[in-house]
């Protein structure tokens, strides 16, 4: 049976087009958004169950592209580069941390290995609501996790950035050659290559079916990430865990089509070993936006910042200069990460055909005074705190 939600305002969060619809009506059928429009102008199904949400707003569920809380959050530091390891083997669906994130409106996460090595392995995109792994799965592989900077220095005997960049290049070179051999075989131009499970991820990367999510920060480190991953090897990659003073590279990131997903540190402070700031405290998102970068999002690095504080990350961006005139902060936790991860056909905005992952909020989610009152995932109510109700698909209380 279709459902209709009537709300004071709908935050569309699309990549382009309308920011909002006042006095909105949204139709949900079979777990998908069927239509959205202005109440009185949108034809409603005669058999629909109508929920009038009064002065509340509706918006799409939020997406976090840097999370470690869908399982243990650790990584096996066997080698400096471990492209074959899979975080999907370590998932505990709808665990307590994911529940808290869900209650705050985070409906999709990229669960990835940690940053103890330059290449921690393969991430997995998951819904945060109740259900099995198979029911939660959005896409595997969700990404190849690459980490640059200080954390992987601690691996083994210790190494500096030059050697780490060498390791990354060698692995990418092997992986790209492996993917090319398989492409030649599939075109009927060569014999079947020997299968190497630890390099299979590069077939997905070469075919643009997934991306490299890159734990990268500081100017020099982000410069290496941009030049190596996308500039030299042509893989789709994005800045993930973007922090500190990387925004002066916005021009290069934009030129290479690399998005900036920022956090868990949203603020830059004056330091001796960086460019002069004249005593200013600067926001990372402000810097990228000031330079004209079109794709800026936010992440938590949960549990470093709790999963439920993803909207607070965007609020900090706004507090430190990010222009939110057209709800760019809401887009930064919805459609921007969805597009970057290649799942915007499923989630990220209120549009016909997408999963009915919908939030009922009391106002702009980048305003810390706003709260989430209801959460739908794929057309099912998974949280309703208006009357402190919360039940999973079997009717069991969630918290």
What are these regions (language model features)?
Residues 86-87, 182-279, 297, 323, ...:
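Active-site core of metal-dependent hydrolases
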Residues 8, 26, 31, 55, ...:
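Divalent metal-coordination and catalytic microenvironments
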Residues 1-45:
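N-terminal metal-binding scaffold of metallo-dependent hydrolase/deaminase domains
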Residues 102-236:
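Polyanionic/metal-chelating signatures
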Residues 8, 12-14, 19-22, 339, ...:
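C-terminal cap of metal-dependent C-N hydrolases
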Residues 69-72, 114-120, 219-223, 244-248, ...:
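Active-site environment of divalent metal-dependent phosphoester hydrolases
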Residues 9, 74, 81-85, 211, ...:
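His/Asp/Glu-enriched, well-ordered alpha-helical/loop segment
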């Amino acid at each position: 049976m279709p459902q209709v939600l009537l709300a004071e305002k709908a935050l569309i969060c699309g990549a382009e087009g309308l920011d909002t619809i006042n006095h909105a009506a949204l139709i949900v059928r079979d777990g998908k958004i069927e239509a959205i429009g202005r109440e009185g102008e949108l034809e409603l199904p005669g058999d629909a169950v109508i929920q009038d949400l009064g002065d509340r707003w509706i918006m799409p569920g939020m997406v976090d592209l840097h999370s470690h809380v869908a399982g243990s959050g650790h990584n096996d530091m066997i080698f400096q580069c471990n492209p074959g390891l899979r975080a999907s083997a370590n998932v505990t669906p709808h665990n307590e941390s994911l529940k808290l994130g869900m209650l705050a409106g985070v409906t999709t996460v990229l669960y990835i290995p940690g940053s103890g090595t330059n290449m921690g392995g393969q991430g997995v995109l998951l819904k945060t609501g109740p259900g099995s792994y198979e029911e939660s799965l959005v896409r595997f592989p969700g990404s190849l996790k690459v980490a640059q900077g200080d954390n992987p220095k601690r691996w083994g005997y210790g190494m500096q950035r030059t050697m780490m960049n060498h390791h990354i290049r060698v692995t990418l070179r092997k992986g790209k050659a492996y993917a090319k051999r398989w492409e030649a075989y599939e075109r009927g131009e060569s014999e079947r290559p020997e299968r190497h499970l630890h390099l299979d991820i590069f077939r997905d990367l070469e075919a643009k079916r997934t991306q490299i999510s890159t734990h990268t920060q500081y100017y020099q480190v982000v410069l290496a990430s941009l030049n190596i991953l996308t500039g030299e090897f042509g893989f789709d990659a994005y800045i993930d865990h973007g922090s500190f003073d990387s925004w002066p590279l916005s021009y290069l990131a934009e030129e290479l089509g690399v998005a900036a997903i920022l956090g868990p540190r949203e603020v830059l402070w004056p330091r001796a070993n960086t460019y002069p700031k004249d005593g200013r405290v600067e926001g990372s998102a402000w810097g990228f936006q000031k330079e004209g970068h079109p794709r800026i999002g936010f992440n938590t690095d949960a549990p470093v910042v709790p999963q439920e504080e993803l909207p607070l990350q965007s609020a900090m961006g706004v507090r430190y200069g990010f222009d939110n005139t057209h709800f760019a902060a809401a887009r930064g936790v919805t459609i921007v990460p969805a597009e970057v991860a290649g799942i915007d056909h499923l989630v990220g905005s209120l549009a016909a055909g997408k999963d009915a992952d919908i939030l009922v909020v009391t106002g702009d989610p980048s305003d810390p005074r706003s709260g989430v009152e209801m959460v739908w995932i794929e057309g099912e109510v998974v949280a309703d705190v208006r009357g402190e109700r919360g039940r999973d698909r079997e009717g069991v209380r969630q918290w």
